[in-house]
Regions:
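SAM-dependent Rossmann-like transferase core, predominantly class I methyltransferases
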Residues: 57-132
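N-terminal auxiliary segments of SAM/dcSAM-dependent transferases
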Residues: 1-76
């Protein structure tokens, strides 16, 4: 179990009771992109290359945390929202796709020079996304 292909198969076997096959593929892709800094193309081109043992151990640890119910966003400590990366911790809420849609709508509604106050923002994703 030392290539992307093998690790993805391992994750599929370990997480199949909690996630769909498509969700597991997406989670693996997120891990490869976040930890290895691979692009989507790298993942496919390098799927049979031997990986560093430290990454393999980290991957297995992430799968164990996922299996215990921890969200991938908390495990990695960040998430994407409205095209931006945000730091997260268990004390902040994970932004939802519905919130991202709301931010898009409000962004279209706001006019230059409008002021907006974001109170109790948690990760700050709403206010920061609207400010840019």
């Amino acid at each position: 179990m030392n290539t992307i292909h093998h690790l993805s198969q391992y994750a599929l076997q370990e997480l199949k009771d909690s996630y769909s096959e498509h969700e597991i593929e997406c989670i693996c892709k997120i891990i490869y992109m976040d930890v290895l800094h691979y692009t989507n193309i790298d993942i496919h081109l390098r799927k049979n290359e031997i990986l560093d043992e430290s990454f393999i151990n980290k991957f297995i640890g992430i799968v164990r945390l996922l299996k215990s119910g921890s969200p991938i966003q908390y495990i990695l400590g960040e998430t994407e929202f409205a095209g931006l990366r945000f730091k997260l911790s268990p004390s902040t809420l994970i932004p939802r796709p519905e919130t991202e849609e709301l931010v898009r709508w409000v962004g279209e509604w706001l006019k230059p020079g409008n002021r907006l106050l974001d109170v109790g923002s948690g990760s700050g994703c709403i206010g920061i996304s609207l400010a840019r």
